[in-house]
Curated annotation (Swiss-Prot):
It comes from Saccharomyces cerevisiae (strain ATCC 204508 / S288c). The chain crosses the membrane at residues 14-34. There is a cross-link at K246 (Glycyl lysine isopeptide (Lys-Gly) (interchain with G-Cter in ubiquitin)). Keywords: Acetylation, Hydrolase, Isopeptide bond, Lipid degradation, Lipid droplet, Lipid metabolism, Membrane, Phosphoprotein, Transmembrane, Transmembrane helix, Ubl conjugation. Its EC number is 3.1.1.13. Residues 35-548 are cytoplasmic. GO terms for molecular function: sterol ester esterase activity. The modification Phosphoserine is found at S462, S466, S521, S538. It catalyses: a sterol ester + H2O = a sterol + a fatty acid + H(+). InterPro entries: AB_hydrolase_1, AB_hydrolase_fold. It comes from the Eukaryota. This is Sterol esterase TGL1. The modification Phosphothreonine is found at T539. Residues 107-402 form the AB hydrolase-1 domain.
Amino acid sequence: MYFPFLGRLSITDYIIVVLVYIESIISSVLKLIPQPMINLFEWLINFSTSSDDNTIEEKLRSAPTIHEMCAIFDISVEDHLVRTEDNYILTLHRIPPISKNRFNNKVVYLHHGLLMCSDVWCCNIERHKNLPFVLHDLGYDVWMGNNRGNKYSTAHLNKPPKSNKFWDFSIDEFAFFDIPNSIEFILDITKVDKVICIGFSQGSAQMFAAFSLSEKLNRKVSHFIAIAPAMTPKGLHNRIVDTLAKSSPGFMYLFFGRKIVLPSAVIWQRTLHPTLFNLCIDIANKILFNWKSFNILPRQKIASYAKLYSTTSVKSIVHWFQILRSQKFQMFEESDNMLNSLTRPYQIANFPTRTNIKIPILLIYGGIDSLVDIDVMKKNLPFNSVFDVKVDNYEHLDLIWGKDADTLVIAKVLRFIEFFNPGNVSVKTNQLLPSASLVEELPSTTWKTTHPTHGLSYRTHSADRSPLSVQADEADEVHNADNSRFLRRVFSTSAIDEDNENEHQDDTEDQIHKEQQRRLSAYLESSKDLRQLDANSSTTALDALNKE
């Protein structure tokens, strides 16, 4: 075995290596402990915190499944089982519309990040900071996915979870099977034409990969919101861990085996006191990613950190390490040779995200998130359909559990969905417009945008005969064909032949996109405050948004 970095390690680095081995030994020992003894430790921990049983954070922490978590907020959840094309059985969690009268005919599909499950969407201690609940209040049909191998999806028709074969999957399988098969199932049940997709962290990467591999899937998604999107992370904060991440896959398998990564974490969740467990998580996040978690309240950590880990394969972690090493969003490389990039007679295929995705995309990223390289990411996505929002002083996990996630993230998600509502495209101008109901909420009584190249003006007056009045100069009608072609290219469901594109047209499209980005940014900044929503309030998110 080749160890390229041992001669460069500091004392601290050696300590980390030793701790990794100690964890492996402890993990092996824990497997020998009888289940009744583990249950006893868990009971002792729960007993020691019994004085706080009535707090919302303790109720969420101790809730064993998403059903109990949502029940705390008087929301019911359905289980749906999806059989993938390679015979894994996945669990989808659905929060159905309140009633047919409240259903807005829109379906949203949310997908979690690495080492997570659907629980992470529903563990905010304040109701209005749980994105699925806000969408539910607004009349959406909400679905939450789960990757193969996590706590809700550990079944296969002929591969037992104890076998190595069950855990032989990477991001490739998530993209080829889990995401598209889940979306197909949702469409079949709900009978709608398209879904709105929202991904967090690796969930975003899985969706980017899935959309890039299937033109058919592009036709079935209307919007995509990527929260804390991961694609080609810069690297890990700690030198030794970053070196390990970029080493041979065989070296990683030597550390962690070929099944579940860090299987002992589940036992630590159950047997450590919440205060100690949360401290361990904060220290690990600081070492690995330099995250300080100042935007997540201590009470919130009690609820959220208990839901932070769910099982996945070592191979999927190795896949991320290969991406870190190559700095390319590529498919998994099976070769075990550390120097194969110099000797292999082939190239590893990259996910064709820049050319094959035809969906409006919003990137919401933290300004101090060490895992997101937004400039590299935007270069790997279609320039004319991607918009981005930076949340200053926010890290990775802050975007779903931060104290201001409602106003800084959720409200902008809602605005983006409405801004790019397919029903808001003017037939006359072929320009995308915000929905009429939401334009009325803008601070000024008149909202005007003049197109930089075509002189198209859009005005909204409260006294007009309709909430939204679009006026276009007749002299600019000759440009509509160009606008129409551009919008078809961005939002079409089939490939458009662009072989005859000239430089002038590319410049025009770039200007159009910049104007759309400017309009969208201003629109997102008009988001209402959703703070008045809480677990005991009957006020819905819709009421809050419409309230002056």
